[in-house]
Amino acid sequence: MISISPSGVSAMQSGRFDDLQHRIDGWLCAELPSWLKRTVGQRKDDLHAVIADGREAGMRVETDFALYALLMFLPGGNWRDIRDERHVAEAMMLPDVTAPNKLMWLEGWLAERGHQIAGV
């Protein structure tokens, strides 16, 4: 399971990518009820694509991947369309913004669209 906290922010070692998809899936199951409406196969395929997209863009921090996945899989949108919104992509890729700051930015972005991250 993924826990978003200031102490959890660090660049991942290459071995950590091996189970990243499983950890993010567990976190999304807890944070996003609509995520459970997808089949296990759909979730696996979609997460694989989003993680590959994040890696290609240079993401290296677990919480960045988790927040990026949450943003991409909100109900009512195609994740590729959301990803292509320039300000979303730029904000999530900033290397000098810590996860709590990204979480605050994302929380505001979600609130504008009527969503809220549980426990934040």
Which ranges hold each PLM region?
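A contiguous, surface-oriented mixed alpha/beta subdomain in the mid-to-C-terminal portion of proteins
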Residues: 1-120
